[in-house]
């Protein structure tokens, strides 16, 4: 096997390892943040922001862990394959990734309900049913939280840059 193929395999393995680490690390944190966001929304408005009709608890669901994992994959891919390479600033990252995740939340809710007839989340009094426009702020915050949780962790698995040579003055 030639060196370029081995190098490519190592890079792919490093990216896959990084992605898996992020999914395992960030997904449960996002899920707990969702619980807090729903509780905050409930305290401010008097009703939960969203409910889970199939969950016995109604205000949270373990099924949403899969969606949170998907959002971590999306944010990670945007980070590695777009934002990092183009030097996209944090505010733009928040707006782009958060808005895409918001649209993904609506799409997943629509597909779960209309295609599979297994509604996942229903937003209270929302014209879009599966997400509300106010959720954009939650999603933008989640992208910022992702960045704060993974700063410097994003490059795990990559070779460290060579240390600068020190000059001794003895």
Model features per residue range: what roles?
Residues 1-170:
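Aromatic-rich, lipid-facing transmembrane alpha helices and their immediate juxtamembrane interface loops
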């Amino acid at each position: 096997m030639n060196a370029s193929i081995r190098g490519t395999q190592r890079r792919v393995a490093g990216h896959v390892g990084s992605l898996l680490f992020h999914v395992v690390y960030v997904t449960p944190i996002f899920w707990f943040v969702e619980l807090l966001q729903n509780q905050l929304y409930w305290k401010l408005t008097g009703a939960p922001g969203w409910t889970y009709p199939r969950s016995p608890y109604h205000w949270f669901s373990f099924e949403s862990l899969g969606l949170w994992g998907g959002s971590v994959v999306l944010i990670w891919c945007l980070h590695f394959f777009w934002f990092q390479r183009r030097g996209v600033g944090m505010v733009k990252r928040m707006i782009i990734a958060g808005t895409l995740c918001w649209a993904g939340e609506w799409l997943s809710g629509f597909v779960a309900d209309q295609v599979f007839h297994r509604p996942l989340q229903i937003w209270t009094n929302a014209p879009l049913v599966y997400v509300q426009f106010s959720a954009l702020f939650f999603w933008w915050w989640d992208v910022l939280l992702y960045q704060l949780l993974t700063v410097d962790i994003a490059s795990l698995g990559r070779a460290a840059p060579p240390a600068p040579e020190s000059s001794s003055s003895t």
